[in-house]
């Protein structure tokens, strides 16, 4: 643990820097760095992430004792630089207390503003500033925020009413005002008193008047917020470890709510939605930062071009825009010029798109935060390629800047343009996060989660979202909000998740109580379908059809860069020519797994398959298999043709035979009729196929050994298809894979059957094709005896699904009953069927690759389980020298990027 617990910054100096994210969190490290490069930042200090972990180890009282001297000295540091005193009524210092983890977690943890106010300080501050409205507006905000965050009065359930919001609405109604900003000084003073009374009633405790007590309450509340429900969920979604902890940054307050020369805002150095190299953002005059991020007031645009685009979408004339909604560039030109200059400086310093928060206090600009901005998958790719072209980063950095999982967003369907032409537009909002979303309306986050779990596609409709809505946002196809701009919580989180979002739709009249939303006089109920276009901000009635996404030139350039540096090829798992062709378009270098059993379930094929299963002699089975052979050959021909010139690895029959027979009476009666036998005969045969543990039973190569005619038929179908294609001038490259090998003798026996069948096929067609025989390593014993098996196998394909099952002893079908408990108790960090277990299963794979290549130096090795498209698993494969990873077609680009990153990490 770091000995130093508190780091100071301010007045162009800082004890930390941008490289200290682990100790100071992203926010603290960047606040220090901005001081070093001359960006105006209010003075303050950062408490390290180690202290957060210590808080959970030793408790609140002990951590306060350990930190007390350092924190009091740090407060004195701020007092000296600001020339005012914490808790002093005549010349008071107020501070903000903010969280800041190593990785950005927007809105997931807590912030407290205006800390240090009490009745005496407020009175003195009002006299000093001659602006009592600003002071008591800040005071009521502080009491509410402190009650919500520190005293934990924020409602947890959707049916609970926020006591503070209820009081505000009551006072506004009594005073005849609509907006919070129109409340009088007396109204604001009344709110402070009523808020304190509500705190006393709800908690049994008085609101703390001592600023030091307030400060410790806030610091410990931020530590606590690291383990709040939404933060835990966000970390799971983003793969952020619980052990990182959060830092706490305490800064002198600067005020955006001191009048018309004050403002607050959020800005981005590039467009976070589409990656366009255009400075953009939003600001509010006479407001505090939380107003912008929370989306409670819809803000104005910072740039003139942004304002004009917004007005055009909203149907507002240029004259009205200039009069009512001027951009900062027009309304505050000097501040805008300074802001624009600093954002450019920050982007060039960090060499990445920046997300910045700022406040203007009576004409002076202050920066409160900068961080690498969250962005959509499309923006991620465009920004990386643009920065490369601009000379700000090199090729390797461009590859490493991109998150493999986010490429998935680029492959999602988009609205069909023809369908859009006839679709009914019911509302226009801001294009907060691009994409196409169709679903049934729900109004609460927990309903979105429940409906999603029941198999429904939903659109979450809210007045505005808050961090508590995270689980519902993750479950929804898209998010629609009545309030909030392009930098609101809904917009920022949706972009980070890759979710479609339309925000700031003023035409929405949402009733949570009735579960309805009214748009231009038309009422839409929970369960009604709507569609969102997150690229244009348009909302449509009903379901609008979608089509496959069109990939950009930037995407192709990124993929070409990946191929330049990668050593691990990416193949695909494909059972149909259509899947094979799609994967080829995504850059797959062949097929790593074709599952032959999926081909048997079409009507005519399943009848012949069942006839083979029912047969009680070799002759009977061969007769049925002869019917199957032309079907199989046609299937294989289509796949080999789609992958012409690339290898196609075909797995022989793997599942147990009982999967091909009906287990219900109606199905058995149909089968009996098809076979021309009695239902009793069918029942007897079905019963005879039953196994207590089919996963370890009569399947894979065991089927081929007990029924070699199955292996022979499949070999003839594969090689027959290849011979036909060769005669047509094509270049088929078949690979025949024997599944579930546990001993070398199993492989030897199956290899003999395959080679004998191959001779027959080549004699029949009068031509030969080159093919390879390999095996699937999915039994631990096969991995441990790889040195033996490699003498017979030309390649190894690791079936990581079954290898994980047999190494852990977990059933993939049953793990869901205990996995949540294992994850919660930290027995497992991740689902081993989603992310390859590198310490156990991975060690077996590494051992088998090494042992196999000692016997056969040119042994080709790949994986073809679900892990073949999971980035960390692909990187592992690259690092241990495997030849390929195979995954589903839509994950091919993800695996290509991960493979390139794995190669670069090995340099």
Which residue stretches match the model-derived regions?
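Conserved alpha/beta-domain cores
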Residues: 98-99, 551, 561-907
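Structural motif
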Residues: 249, 442, 459-461, 480, ...
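Glycine-rich phosphate/ribose-binding loops and adjacent secondary-structure elements
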Residues: 364-366, 459, 466-474, 486-493, ...
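A short, small-residue-rich loop immediately preceding and capping a beta-strand
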Residues: 477-483, 501, 862
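Nucleotide/phosphate-binding sheet-loop regions of phosphoryl- and nucleotidyl-transfer enzymes
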Residues: 1-423, 450, 456-459, 466-471, ...
């Amino acid at each position: 643990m770091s000995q130093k617990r508190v780091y100071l910054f301010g007045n162009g100096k800082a004890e930390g820097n941008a490289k200290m994210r682990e100790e100071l969190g992203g926010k603290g490290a960047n606040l220090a760095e901005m001081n070093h490069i001359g960006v105006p930042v209010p003075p303050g200090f950062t408490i390290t992430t180690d202290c957060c972990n210590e808080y959970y180890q030793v408790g609140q009282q002990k951590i306060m004792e350990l930190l007390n001297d350092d924190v009091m000295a740090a407060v004195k540091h701020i007092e000296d630089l600001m020339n005012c005193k914490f808790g002093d009524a005549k010349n008071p210092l107020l501070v903000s207390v903010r969280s800041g983890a190593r990785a950005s977690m927007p809105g997931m943890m807590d912030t407290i503003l205006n800390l240090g106010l009490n009745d005496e300080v407020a009175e003195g501050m009002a006299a000093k500033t001659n602006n009592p409205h600003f002071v008591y507006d800040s005071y009521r905000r502080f009491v509410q925020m402190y009650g919500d965050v520190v005293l934990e009065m924020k409602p947890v359930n959707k049916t609970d009413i926020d006591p503070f919001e209820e009081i505000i609405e009551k006072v506004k109604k009594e005073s005849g005002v609509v907006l919070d900003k129109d409340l009088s000084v007396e109204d604001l003073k009344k709110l402070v008193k009523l808020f304190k009374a509500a705190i006393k009633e709800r908690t049994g405790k008085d609101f703390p008047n001592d600023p030091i007590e307030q400060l410790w309450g806030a610091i410990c509340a931020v530590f606590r917020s690291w383990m709040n429900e939404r933060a835990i969920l966000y970390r799971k979604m983003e793969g952020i470890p619980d052990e990182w902890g959060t830092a706490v940054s305490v800064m002198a307050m600067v005020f955006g709510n001191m009048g018309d020369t004050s403002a607050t805002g959020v800005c981005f150095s590039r467009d976070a939605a589409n990656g366009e190299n255009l400075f953009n953002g939003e600001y509010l005059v006479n407001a505090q930062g939380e107003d912008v991020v929370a989306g409670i007031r819809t803000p104005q645009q910072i740039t003139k071009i942004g304002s004009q685009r917004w007005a055009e979408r909203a149907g507002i004339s240029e004259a009205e825009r200039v009069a009512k909604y001027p951009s900062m560039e027009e309304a505050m030109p000097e501040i805008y010029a300074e802001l624009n200059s600093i954002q450019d400086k920050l982007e060039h310093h960090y060499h990445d798109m920046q997300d910045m928060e700022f406040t203007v206090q009576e004409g002076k600009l202050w920066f409160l935060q900068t961080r690498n901005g969250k962005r959509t998958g499309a923006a991620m790719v465009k920004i990386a390629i643009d920065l490369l072209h601009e000379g700000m980063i090199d090729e390797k950095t461009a590859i490493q800047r991109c998150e493999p999982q986010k490429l998935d967003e680029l492959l999602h369907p988009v609205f069909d343009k023809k369908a859009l032409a006839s679709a009914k537009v019911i509302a226009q909002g801001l294009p907060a996060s691009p994409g196409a979303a169709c679903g049934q309306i729900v109004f609460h986050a927990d309903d979105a989660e429940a409906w999603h779990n029941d198999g429904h596609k939903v659109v979450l409709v809210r007045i505005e979202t808050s961090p508590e809505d995270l689980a519902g946002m993750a479950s929804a196809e898209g998010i629609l909000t009545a309030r909030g701009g392009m930098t609101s919580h809904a917009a920022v989180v949706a972009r980070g998740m890759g979710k479609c979002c339309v925000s700031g739709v003023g035409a929405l009249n949402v009733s949570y109580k009735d579960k309805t939303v009214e748009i231009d006089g038309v009422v839409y109920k929970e369960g009604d379908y709507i569609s969102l276009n997150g690229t244009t901000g348009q909302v449509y009635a009903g379901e609008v059809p979608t089509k496959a996404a069109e990939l950009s030139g930037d995407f192709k350039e990124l993929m070409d860069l990946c191929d330049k540096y990668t050593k691990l090829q990416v193949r695909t798992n494909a059972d149909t020519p259509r899947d094979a062709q799609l994967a080829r378009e995504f850059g797959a270098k062949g097929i790593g797994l074709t599952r032959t059993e999926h081909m048997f379930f079409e009507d005519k094929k399943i009848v012949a398959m069942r006839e083979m299963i029912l047969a009680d002699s070799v002759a009977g089975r061969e007769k049925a298999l002869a019917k199957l052979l032309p079907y199989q050959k046609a299937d294989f021909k289509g796949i080999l043709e789609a992958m012409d010139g690339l290898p196609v690895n075909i797995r022989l029959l793997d599942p147990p035979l009982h999967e091909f027979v009906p287990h219900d009476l109606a199905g058995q009666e149909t089968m009996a009729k098809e076979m021309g036998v009695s239902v009793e005969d069918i029942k007897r045969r079905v019963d005879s196929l039953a196994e207590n543990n089919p996963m370890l039973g009569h399947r894979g190569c065991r089927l081929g050994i007990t029924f070699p005619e199955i292996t022979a038929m499949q070999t003839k179908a594969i090689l027959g298809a290849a011979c036909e294609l060769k005669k047509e001038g094509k270049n088929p490259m078949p690979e025949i894979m024997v599944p579930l090998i546990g001993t070398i003798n199993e492989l030897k026996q199956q290899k003999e059957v395959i080679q004998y069948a191959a001779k027959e096929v080549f004699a029949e067609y009068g031509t030969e094709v080159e093919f390879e025989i390999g095996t699937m390593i999915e039994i631990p014993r096969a991995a441990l005896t790889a040195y033996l098996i490699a003498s017979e196998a030309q390649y190894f394909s690791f079936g990581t699904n079954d290898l994980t099952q047999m190494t852990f002893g977990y059933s993939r079908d049953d793990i869901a009953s205990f996995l949540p408990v294992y994850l919660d108790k930290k027995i497992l960090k991740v689902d081993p069927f989603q992310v390859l277990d590198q310490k156990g299963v991975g060690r077996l794979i590494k051992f088998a690759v090494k042992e196999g290549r000692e016997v056969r130096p040119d042994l080709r090795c790949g994986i073809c389980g679900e892990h073949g498209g999971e980035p960390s698993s692909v990187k592992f494969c690259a690092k241990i020298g495997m030849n390929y990873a195979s995954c589903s077609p839509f994950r091919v680009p993800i695996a290509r990027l991960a493979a390139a990153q794995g190669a670069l990490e090995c340099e």
